[in-house]
Design a protein with these regions (language model features):
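Helix-centered, glycine/charged polyanion-binding patches within enzymatic domains
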Residues: 95-100, 106-107, 190-256
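Alpha-helical support elements that line or immediately flank enzyme active sites
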Residues: 1-7
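Short, charged amphipathic recognition helices of the HTH superfamily
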Residues: 8-17
């Protein structure tokens, strides 16, 4: 319900459950039934994640949507999911560094922070990462999706550590799940234009119409692929994955 009706927080959802008849009907509550405390969500979240309830729900949705999915043309992409950790929590692993000032805040001015020497005290698994040149480095993870190109439906999603190889490694893992038996295409942005990715995909009988990266080097995508009429179609279709990312972050509450 939070996602469908853009309810910004669990506390707000509980508040609306007290008077919203539609919400009460959705969860099977009687009109005069007491609403639970918002802390119940926090207590149950770990249990639901451990039991893979969300994954089970996702697979059932995929089963219903299967008639509308392409089995030939796909797209992979990744996006930065911010961690619930502030930049000020990203300190040296050895405990050294500038001492806290007034208010307990640490002054990082002039200090070069790297994942090799620093980590977040509140989320040690988060990594300082920037998705593209010129963008701000943030503490977070990388989210990865596999999309079919006919209607822009997502077939797979998962989260990894944020690092320079994560998107390409995730693409290979998702490519392995695409059913064989026919020749398929897997498009992506310039980040996937490497000899390693292109060769591995071709070894799986997958054509890689990924965007070419010609900056200071030669693209790994050959001319027969780029000249094919389907290349331009794949490039147009792959941009639909950005719509999924925008929805996930603006509506689906997955910005962090």
């Amino acid at each position: 319900m939070q996602v469908f009706y853009s309810v910004r927080s669990e506390r707000m959802l509980i508040e609306q459950l007290q008077y919203n008849l539609l919400f009460q009907w959705f969860v099977g509550m009687e009109m005069d039934e007491a609403v639970w405390n918002h802390a119940v969500f926090s207590k149950n979240r770990e249990r639901l994640l451990n039991e893979e309830i969300a994954e089970s729900f996702f697979q059932r949705v995929l089963g219903r949507a299967k008639p509308h999915m392409s089995d030939e043309h796909f797209t992979v992409d990744g996006t930065l999911i911010e961690a619930w950790a502030s930049q000020k929590s990203f300190g040296r692993k050895d405990g050294k560094g500038n001492p806290p000032g007034a208010g307990g805040e640490v002054d990082f001015h002039g200090e070069k922070r790297k994942n090799q020497t620093h980590e977040s005290t509140t989320d040690p698994d988060a990594r300082l990462f920037k998705k593209s040149t010129g963008s701000e480095a943030k503490l977070g993870y990388l989210g990865h999706v596999l999309m079919e190109n006919r209607n822009g439906l997502l077939l797979q999603t998962f989260l990894t550590e944020a690092n320079g190889r994560a998107e390409r490694d995730a693409a290979m893992l998702m490519a392995e799940t695409i059913p064989g038996g026919k020749r398929v295409t897997l498009s992506g942005d310039k980040n996937y234009d490497t000899q390693e990715v292109v060769q591995e995909l071709r070894g799986m009988n997958i054509t890689p119409p990924v965007a070419q990266n010609n900056t200071k080097r030669r693209s790994a995508v050959d001319e027969p692929t780029t000249r094919h009429a389907g290349f331009e179609v794949s490039q147009r279709k792959r941009k639909r994955v950005e719509q999924s990312f925008r929805w996930m972050k603006m509506v689906g509450m997955l910005r962090k």
